[in-house]
Amino acid sequence: MTDALPLVLVPGLISSPRIYAPVIPALWRLGPVMVANHVRDDSMAAIARRILSEAPPRFALAGHSMGGYIALEIMRQAPERVGRLALINTQARPDTPEASARRRTMITRAKEGDYHGVVDELFAGFVHPSRQDDPRLRQLVHDMAEEVGVIGFIRQLTAIMSRPDSRPTLTAIRCPTLVLTGDTDNTIPNSLSKEMADGIDGSWLVVLENCGHLPQPEQPEETAQALMEWLRG
């Protein structure tokens, strides 16, 4: 049994702990696993502070999508507490004006009762084209969205829109870092994952085949294997 650091997993937009369910059994064998709550605050700084207040003194940190934005904020606030970092289907860039405009429209629609319609549209960009008609994946995304709720969703979008540009801070990351993405991510193009990997000294990039924005349920075995290798060092 390895002496792996405790692991803190941070989900993404409209994602609950369920997003990590396909990989937790494998990761749990290596050490304690905690899934962070990221729906109680509406800024990256506040979300990161809350996670740090609840996390072990020193830990491995993995963030998926929005969770990657949060992970990069944690690296700004307390880099000495993070022994390993995994950035999954995420990016270091801030929101573009066009992306923020789309998010404001989503907030309006969710407030007006079209939350499920918004979730359906997000799902279409989340999964690999071959999985668009996968009822299991669609149900998973809708179940998670229900758990996050409209208020949590609005908080998440508010935090995402105001996130800082993390590209200038990538060179300060010194811990072993995995950058993982899918070959067909239509939400955050894998070119942006490659950009992060290029900016973090000593990091390594894993691109999963036949995978969109949700590698944990889309390619669970490959995702778990990559994360286990990262944890074991």
Question: Where are these predicted regions, by residue range?
Answer:
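Conserved alpha/beta-hydrolase catalytic His-Asp/Glu region
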Residues: 95-98, 113-172
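Catalytic histidine-centered segment of alpha/beta-hydrolase-like enzymes
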Residues: 211-224
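Flexible "cap/lid" loop of the alpha/beta hydrolase fold
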Residues: 44, 76-77, 81-120
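Short beta-strand/loop motif that positions the catalytic acidic residue
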Residues: 173, 179-181, 185
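Conserved HGGG/HGGXW glycine-rich cap/lid loop of the alpha/beta-hydrolase fold
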Residues: 1-50, 64
